[in-house]
């Protein structure tokens, strides 16, 4: 299950970072 969790995290991370950068601007 760890492998699938890492894959999901890798997919979610860019969008979370994108939202964070948008809020900082």
Curated annotation (Swiss-Prot):
GO molecular function per UniProt: toxin activity
TM region positions: none
Tissue distribution: Expressed by the venom gland.
One of the protein's GO biological processes: killing of cells of another organism
Cross-referenced Pfam families: Antimicrobial_4 (PF08024)
Cellular localization per UniProt: Secreted; Target cell membrane
Cystine pairings recorded for this chain: none
Any GO CC annotation of this UniProt entry: membrane
Domain of life according to the entry: Eukaryota
Primary subcellular site in the record, as a coarse category: secreted
Protein's UniProt keywords contain RNA-binding: no
Keywords: Antibiotic, Antimicrobial, Cytolysis, Fungicide, Hemolysis, Membrane, Secreted, Target cell membrane, Target membrane, Toxin
Family the UniProt entry places it in: Belongs to the non-disulfide-bridged peptide (NDBP) superfamily. Medium-length antimicrobial peptide (group 3) family. Ponericin-W subfamily.
Function: Has a broad spectrum of activity against both Gram-positive and Gram-negative bacteria and S.cerevisiae. Has insecticidal and hemolytic activities. May act by disrupting the integrity of the bacterial cell membrane.
Identification of the protein by name: M-poneritoxin-Ng1a
Organism: Neoponera goeldii (Ponerine ant)
Lineage: Eukaryota, Metazoa, Ecdysozoa, Arthropoda, Hexapoda
